C-alpha cells in the first residue's frame, strides 16, 4: 500500500520551524504497518516558507519527498516502493499502469506579501514550468491511468472552489474568513483553488486544457478546504 500526503503537515499560521519539523518526523516514525517511504508527499500552503527564505526549505528538510535530507527527515529514497522522477516541486512515479503526477504548492513569485506576512495565504500556485511538465507527462502517457495531485483542487470542481466561496460576508457586508482566511492581497477574489499558474491570476490553465482534452487524466487529488465530506457549498 502507498499513501499520498496532500500537504499542510504544518498546522500553524506562522512560517514553520525546526521544532515543528521534528514533530512531523516523530509522528511519521510511529507508523505501525507502513514505512515512512510508503507516503508520497506534496507541499501545502501552510508548509511554504517565508518569501525571504529559500523556497520551501522547511518542507524539503523535514518532509523531503526526494530523500535529499535523510539526516533530518529520515527518508531514504532507495526504500521507496516505487521510485520517483523529478524534483521536490514536481515529480512522478508509476504503479503498474497508473501514473502519479505530484505537484507542490509554492509562494507566488510575483507577490511581495504572502506566506508569513499573510499567514496561510489561501490561493494555490504552480510555475509555468510545472504546468508544462504536467501537460507533457499527460500527453506522452496516453495509455496510462493518470492521477494528478496538488494541494488545491481546480476551480469550480468541488465544495467552496468558486470565486468568493471560501469566505463570507459579515452583518455589515464586509468579507471575513470562512473556509479560509480572507486575504485580499494574497488571494484575490477569495480564491481558494489553484489560482496562479505561471504568475497569471485566475489562469484557468489546467481547466482549459482538461476541457479541450476530455479524458486525458482520470483523477485529480486535492485537499486544502477544511470541511465535512457531505458539504456542497457552492452547489458542488
What are these regions (language model features)?
Residues 2, 33-34, 94, 99-101, ...:
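His/acidic metal-ligating clusters that form di-metal
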Residues 14-135, 140, 205, 216, ...:
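Extended active-site neighborhood of metal-dependent phosphoesterases/phosphodiesterases
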Residues 10-13, 107, 153-157:
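Short acidic, S/G/P-rich loop/turn micro-motifs used as interaction or catalytic elements
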Residues 1-19:
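N-terminal active-site segment of His-dependent metallophosphoesterases
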Residues 7, 49, 109, 172-174, ...:
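Intrinsic disorder/low-complexity detector
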Residues 7-8, 44-45, 151, 223-224:
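Active-site glycine-centered loops adjacent to acidic/histidine catalytic or metal-binding residues
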Amino acid at each position: 500500500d502507498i499513501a499520498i500526503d496532500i500537504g499542510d503537515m504544518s498546522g500553524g499560521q506562522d512560517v514553520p520551524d525546526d521544532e515543528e519539523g521534528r514533530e512531523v518526523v516523530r509522528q511519521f516514525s510511529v507508523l505501525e504497518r507502513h514505512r515512512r517511504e510508503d507516503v508520497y508527499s506534496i507541499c501545502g500552503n501552510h508548509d511554504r516558507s517565508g518569501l525571504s527564505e529559500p523556497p520551501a526549505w522547511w518542507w524539503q528538510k523535514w518532509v523531503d519527498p526526494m530523500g535529499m535530507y535523510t539526516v533530518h527527515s529520515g527518508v531514504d529514497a532507495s526504500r521507496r516502493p516505487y521510485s520517483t522522477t523529478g524534483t521536490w516541486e514536481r515529480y512522478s512515479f508509476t504503479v503498474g499502469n497508473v501514473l502519479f503526477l505530484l505537484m507542490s504548492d509554492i509562494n507566488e513569485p510575483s507577490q511581495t506579501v504572502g506566506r508569513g506576512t499573510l499567514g496561510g495565504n489561501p490561493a494555490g500556485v504552480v510555475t509555468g514550468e510545472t504546468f508544462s511538465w504536467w501537460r507533457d507527462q499527460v500527453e506522452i502517457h496516453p495509455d496510462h491511468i493518470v492521477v494528478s495531485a496538488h494541494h488545491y483542487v481546480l476551480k469550480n470542481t468541488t465544495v467552496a472552489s468558486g470565486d468568493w466561496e471560501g469566505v463570507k460576508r459579515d452583518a455589515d457586508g464586509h468579507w471575513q474568513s470562512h473556509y479560509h482566511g480572507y486575504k485580499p492581497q494574497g488571494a484575490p477574489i477569495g480564491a481558494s483553488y489553484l489560482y496562479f499558474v505561471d504568475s497569471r491570476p485566475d489562469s484557468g490553465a489546467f481547466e482549459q486544457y482538461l476541457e479541450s482534452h476530455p479524458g486525458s487524466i482520470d483523477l485529480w487529488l486535492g485537499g486544502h478546504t477544511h470541511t465535512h465530506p457531505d458539504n456542497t457549498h457552492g452547489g458542488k
